[in-house]
Amino acid sequence: MFGPNVVVATAGHPILPELREQGYQYNAPVHIGKNCWIGAGALIMPGITIGDNVVIGAGSVVTKDIPSNTVAVGNPCRVLRKINDRDKEFYFKDRKIDWDEINNNL
């Protein structure tokens, strides 16, 4: 799931002005795993791999690979914590997930 204004960049340019003047650029694929949530305004740089079940915070700039089952935020984006059992119990602060209601609506 992508929030609004997410950028996934696959092209970059070298630092040396002589190469940039000649129009040189490079391309590097970005890999995003399953069940990821990329927050609004996040920027994912070329060559990055984001594992499965990852949450990237809004406005983050992802410059390094992010491992699976983590929450990562910031500029530069860093792993804040692993996704844990509390995440299966609460959806926001102290608001509990009503699993009976969810399962009845499947």
Would you name each region that the model predicts?
Residues 40-64:
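Beta-rich strand-turn-strand
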Residues 1-48, 83-84:
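Flexible, glycine/small-residue-enriched loop-and-beta-strand segment within the central core
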Residues 34, 52-53, 68-69:
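Short acidic capping loops at alpha-helix termini that bridge into adjacent secondary structure
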Residues 20, 67-68, 73-76:
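Acidic, glycine-centered active-site loop in nucleotide-sugar glycosyltransferases
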Residues 6, 13, 49, 60-61, ...:
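Flexible glycine-rich beta->alpha loop in the catalytic core of nucleotide-sugar glycosyltransferases
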Residues 75-106:
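Terminal amphipathic alpha-helical/low-complexity segments used for targeting or macromolecular assembly
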Residues 37, 55, 71-73:
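Short-chain dehydrogenase/reductase
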